[in-house]
């Protein structure tokens, strides 16, 4: 096993939080969000982190000051982020572009990156100190849309952590913002890709018309709530050897499937086996996020470069727990591929129309059988470079019971692969890990990275 960095404890000294406002006057106006943005399920706050080592060429330069100044300049281009969300007619969200600013926290930690362990991966110890939850800042409405904390480390590295209001953007959109911020931090006068609003492109049609059955929003037939579980948060690394072992479980005609498809089907089945559903007929749903910027869901003409709103849908694959556990891996893979095949431009429009017709239905996150998989590798958070080089880690801060998140990762041996972040009840996590161990049969358990809270 990888070192248990959760035993690491350190102190973080924070300066009082401040509001960083745009460096120049910006338009005072209201901007409507799209009907994809406006989903109930996206009215949430999402943390992300990028971590940087010391760079001798940047000696004498303060990442806090550089990023604070760059943030003010970046908000001139991304001025809606400096505003506040309000409820509009029929409860539809809109941005009041007030220019009030975003929360910024300067901090110092008495710890080095090496103390986090050889392989730097979530969940991170003391993360609540690296992204401080400012009292009164966690509202969806009438609150700052971004909270950013930059923490200097004793080794000369630093941690950039951000909490975003998910209704404003998805991972691709946030990556675009962070890269623009980093470009200005490196001395550029403006972001290489200028932001584009155009949320009307993902609004409901007039008249709205639902053209698909959207199982992802339908109430499960059996109630099985997950609220009583004590969760263990873990990370698992899948390099070429692990991914090849999974491919060998499939017949030849499926072996050429994408890495993401194969890994997702495998983890869906492993998770179901680990949960040991008592009711064999309990429904298990896999929602796989598809983005309208690329792939099957891409628009014609494409969404404009610079669009940073939410642009994804999540078609659902459905099976009983019994069938998912008793059938070979190809069964899960075929179900997932069938669900993904629905992901087209028309499907995106149908979701937007559904939000208007049905009053913003939500996902059923609290059901044991619900699982959403989000591939963040295309967001390329590790490429965000404030001048200290690329991040040694960039992406989500942890997985959740209802989701598995994929992050691009290079381990301490230089092997590139995918880090899968998830959370399960303790006993289920032990069974989940055993499923992986039994398949890979590796004596080097450090290849399967695990840490827990």
Swiss-Prot record:
Tissues in which the UniProt entry reports expression: Expressed in roots and hypocotyls. Detected in seeds, leaves and cotyledons, but not in young developing leaves.
UniProt family annotation: Belongs to the plant acyltransferase family.
Record protein name field: 13-hydroxylupanine O-tigloyltransferase
Source organism of this protein record: Lupinus albus (White lupine)
Regulation of this protein's activity per its record: Inhibited by N-ethylmaleimide, p-chloromercuribenzoic acid and diethylpyrocarbonate (DEPC).
Job description of the protein: Acyl-CoA-dependent acyltransferase involved in the synthesis of lupanine alkaloids. Can use both (-)-13alpha-hydroxymultiflorine and (+)-13alpha-hydroxylupanine as substrates. Lower activity with (-)-3beta, 13alpha-dihydroxylupanine, but no activity with (+)-epilupinine and (-)-lupinine as substrates. Tigloyl-CoA, benzoyl-CoA and, more slowly, acetyl-CoA, propionyl-CoA and 2-butenoyl-CoA can act as acyl donors.
Active site, UniProt feature: 166 (proton acceptor), 385 (proton acceptor)
EC nos: 2.3.1.93
Highest taxon in the source lineage: Eukaryota
Reactions listed under catalytic activity: 13-hydroxylupanine + (2E)-2-methylbut-2-enoyl-CoA = 13-(2-methylcrotonoyloxy)lupanine + CoA
InterPro entries named among the record's database cross-references: CAT-like_dom_sf (IPR023213), Plant_acyltransferase (IPR050898)
């Amino acid at each position: 096993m990888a070192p248990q960095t959760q035993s690491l404890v350190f102190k973080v000294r924070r300066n009082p939080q401040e509001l960083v406002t745009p460096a120049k006057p910006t338009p005072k106006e209201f901007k409507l969000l799209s009907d994809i943005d406006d989903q109930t399920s996206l009215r949430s706050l999402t943390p992300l982190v990028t971590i940087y080592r010391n760079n001798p060429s940047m000696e004498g330069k303060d990442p806090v000051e550089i990023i604070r100044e760059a943030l003010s300049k970046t908000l001139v281009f991304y001025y809606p982020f400096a505003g506040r969300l309000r409820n509009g007619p029929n409860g539809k969200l809109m941005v009041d572009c007030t220019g009030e600013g975003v929360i910024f926290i300067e901090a110092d930690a008495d710890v080095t990156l090496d103390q986090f362990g050889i392989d730097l991966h979530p969940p991170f110890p003391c993360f609540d100190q690296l992204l401080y939850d400012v009292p009164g800042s966690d509202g969806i409405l009438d609150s700052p849309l971004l909270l950013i904390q930059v923490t200097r480390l004793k080794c000369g590295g630093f941690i950039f952590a951000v909490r975003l209001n998910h209704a404003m953007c998805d991972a691709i959109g946030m990556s675009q913002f962070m890269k623009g911020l980093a470009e200005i931090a490196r001395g550029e006068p403006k972001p290489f890709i200028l932001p584009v609003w155009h949320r009307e492109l993902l609004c409901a049609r007039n008249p709205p018309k639902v053209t698909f059955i959207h199982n992802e929003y339908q109430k499960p037939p059996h109630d099985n709530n997950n609220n009583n579980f004590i969760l263990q948060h873990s990370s698992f690394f899948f390099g070429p050897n692990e991914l090849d072992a999974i491919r060998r479980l499939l017949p030849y005609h499926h072996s050429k499937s994408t890495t993401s498809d194969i890994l997702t089907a495998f983890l869906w089945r492993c998770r179901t086996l680990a949960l040991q559903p008592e009711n064999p007929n309990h429904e298990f749903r896999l929602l796989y996020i598809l983005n309208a910027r690329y792939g099957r869901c891409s628009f014609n003409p494409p969404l404009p470069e610079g669009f940073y709103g939410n642009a994804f849908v999540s078609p659902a694959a459905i099976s009983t727990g019994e069938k998912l556990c008793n059938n070979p891996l190809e069964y899960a893979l075929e179900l997932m591929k069938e669900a993904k095949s629905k992901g087209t431009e028309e499907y995106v429009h149908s979701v937007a129309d559904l939000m208007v017709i049905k009053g913003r239905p939500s996902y059923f996150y609290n059901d044991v059988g619900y699982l959403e998989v989000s591939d963040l590798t295309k967001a390329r958070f590790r490429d965000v470079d404030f001048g200290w080089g690329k991040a040694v880690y960039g992406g989500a801060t942890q997985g959740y019971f209802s989701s598995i998140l994929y992050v691009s990762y290079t381990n301490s041996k230089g092997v590139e692969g995918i880090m899968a972040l998830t959370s399960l009840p303790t006993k289920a996590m032990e069974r989940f890990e055993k499923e992986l161990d039994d398949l890979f049969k590796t004596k080097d358990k450090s290849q399967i990275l695990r840490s827990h809270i």
